[in-house]
Curated annotation (Swiss-Prot):
PANTHER family: UNCHARACTERIZED PROTEIN YQGE, UPF0301 PROTEIN YQGE. It comes from Serratia proteamaculans (strain 568). NCBIfam families: PRK00228.1-1. Belongs to the UPF0301 (AlgH) family. GO terms for cellular component: cytosol. Pfam families: DUF179. SUPFAM superfamilies: VC0467-like. This is UPF0301 protein Spro_4027.
Amino acid sequence: MNLQHHFLIAMPSLQDPRFKRSVIYVCEHNEDGAMGLVINKPVEQFTVETVLSKLKIMPQARDPAISLDKPVFAGGPLADDRGFILHTPRKGFGSSIQISPDTMITTSKDVLETLGTPEQPDDVLVALGYAGWEKGQLEQEVLENAWLTIEADTDILFHTPIASRWREAANRLGIDICSIANHAGHA
């Protein structure tokens, strides 16, 4: 099972406040473990503009038509002082990894310097921190019915309203997530 470029959709029974009703985009999944970003839990009163201001990044070619009043997400409980930028493919950043034909993740400052300019990637999601799993841990959580899985959809990732992402991701599986009982079993 390789869940890279998949969504993990928290089952209603998952009560950990860090992951309750969350959707996680899996950026990497291999024999050593997995890493992903929560894409539906914005940090309150923290925007992309706030991040750029705190880091003293003032792009020279700033386009006022491009809004920086976009949420920054609590990507997960690990390394929550580090930024992770999911975006549509654009080459030329110092530390980028292509996740799928439609998505990349960048952790270098140079991507931040393009935000709000004509040089920024078409779609961008900024997160602080990440969710991580040790070898076999994610697979076990899936077997224990903590998560539903589905191949990621960039429309949900970048364009679906934040409050609708959990329900919409489950809807893509044909499931009304709110009607699922809190405890599931295996047939």
